Amino acid sequence: MSITVEEKARLIKEYATKEGDTGSPEVQVAILSSRIATLTEHFKSHKKDNHSRRGLLMMVAQRRKLLDYLKKKEEARYTALIARLGLRR
């Protein structure tokens, strides 16, 4: 249900703003989006897995907070990120 180390490293490299950047909102949102997509696929076959569903809801809330923060600080970066990730906002 989680993403692999290689997938996480690829996301960090793709969305990092500078070398060694793992904590920027862009990287965090990209990793959360990947984990959310993985869990969404999991729920297609495990409809009654409510413990994981709670984790999914917490991840969605965390992503929402990070996106709101980014929109408040720099709206240009926010719009570029949601366009790259294909999020509907």
From Swiss-Prot:
SMART domains: Ribosomal_S15 (SM01387). Part of the 30S ribosomal subunit. Forms a bridge to the 50S subunit in the 70S ribosome, contacting the 23S rRNA. Gene3D superfamilies: 6.10.250.3130, S15/NS1, RNA-binding. This is Small ribosomal subunit protein uS15. InterPro entries: Ribosomal_uS15, Ribosomal_uS15_bac-type, uS15_NS1_RNA-bd_sf. It comes from the Bacteria. It holds the Pfam family Ribosomal_S15. GO terms for biological process: translation. One of its GO terms (cellular component) is cytosolic small ribosomal subunit. Keywords: Ribonucleoprotein, Ribosomal protein, RNA-binding, rRNA-binding. One of the primary rRNA binding proteins, it binds directly to 16S rRNA where it helps nucleate assembly of the platform of the 30S subunit by binding and bridging several RNA helices of the 16S rRNA. PANTHER family: RIBOSOMAL PROTEIN S15, BACTERIAL AND ORGANELLAR, SMALL RIBOSOMAL SUBUNIT PROTEIN US15M. Belongs to the universal ribosomal protein uS15 family. GO terms for molecular function: rRNA binding; structural constituent of ribosome.
